[in-house]
Every structure is written in C-alpha cells, then in structure tokens.
Amino acid sequence: LNRRLSEISNDIQVSFEFFPPNTPEMETTLWNSIERLAPLKPSFVSVTYGAGSGTRDRTHDIIKRIQKDTALLAAPHLTCIDAGREELIQIAKDYWASGVRHIVALRGDLPNSDEKPSMYASDLVELLRSVADFDISVAAYPEGHPEAPNPQFDLLNLKRKIDAGANRAISQFFFDIESYLRFRDRCVTVGIDVEIIPGILPVTNY
C-alpha cells in the first residue's frame, strides 16, 4: 500500500476513513493506524458517524483529538437520514464553534421501511452552506450506487450535490483502478470539475 500510494501521490490525492472505536482495544488500534498512515500525507482523514448521540459524540471526540495531536486535516461524517433540519443546523453550528471546518455530507443508510427520506445529501450540502462556509465533501460511486437504476442517474445525482455547493467528492471503495479513472472521465462530461478523491478504508485487523 505504501509503495502504491507513493507512486500515485503526485497525480491522485487520497483520504482515509476511520470508525469511532467502541472499546479501549479498538481505540489503541485506531491511534496506531493514524500514526502509521500520517506519513503518507493524505488530503484528509474522515471519521464515520452513526445514529444515536453516543456514536456522534465519539466521532466528535476523535476529530478533536486528531486536530489537537496530529498535523492531519480531519473531517467528521454527517448524515441526514436520522435527524431533523433543526438538529442538523445545531450540530453544524457546534462543529463550526469547535473549529471543525470540513464535513463529509451524506444521506446515510435507509431504514427498513418504504418511506422516502425527507432529505438527501444535496439538501444537507445546502443546509451546511446556509450555516457557515464549510469545506464540504460528498460521496461518489465509481462502481455505481446500489440504489441507482443506471450509471447516468448516479452521475447526475453526484452533480446535484456538487451544484448544491460541495467542494469535492470522495469515492466509495473500489477494487478496479480503471473503473475509478473511467468514472472520473465521465464526471467531466457532465460538468463535474471538482476533485474525485479515492477513499481508502485501512484494514486494522485480519
């Protein structure tokens, strides 16, 4: 991994994604991983975010420690599927007040119901833009979103997020570099001219 990243570092920027730890052992693994990956100089690192205040608080705590103890740029994930508009506005204000300037804006996983979501990622981007001048990343899917009926639908959905004010897109994980490069070219054809950063999920145990 180190060798491959060094080979492409001049052409393609990468980001790393981490999960908030649930146990002391997982927390030790997390910080060991961050220490080992920091010399690779990713564009930024992101920390996932789940439903419930406990996970959200852990995400915020990890972000604050990364900001304090490392030179890495850190970005929390924020999802809109399980929170109302006023709650999201308050979360965004709290992040801004604590010095967080970069947020990864996501819809989030749908619950097990037929009810359509009241907000999508593009709506969340607009909401964040209304709160403060955040640096906003959104998700991209080089191999296609599982809910998209076709690749063009998926691509136009990404364009809506960019048009709403996102600064860049982070790809979901992929196993074929050619699929990423083709996707990046297709983005240009529909007028998406922001960075499409390959996301990397570090394997911390196996």
List the predicted regions and their residue ranges:
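N-terminal amphipathic alpha-helix/helix-capping segment at the start of soluble metabolic enzymes
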Residues: 1-16, 23, 67
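Acidic (Asp/Glu)-rich catalytic clusters
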Residues: 5-9, 34-41, 60-71, 92-100, ...
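Hydrophobic faces of well-ordered beta-strands that scaffold small-molecule active sites
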Residues: 12-20, 43-47, 74-78, 103-105, ...
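Alpha-helix-loop-beta-strand connector modules within alpha/beta enzyme cores
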Residues: 53-77, 118-139, 181-200
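Glycine-rich anion/phosphate-binding loops
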Residues: 80-94, 115-118
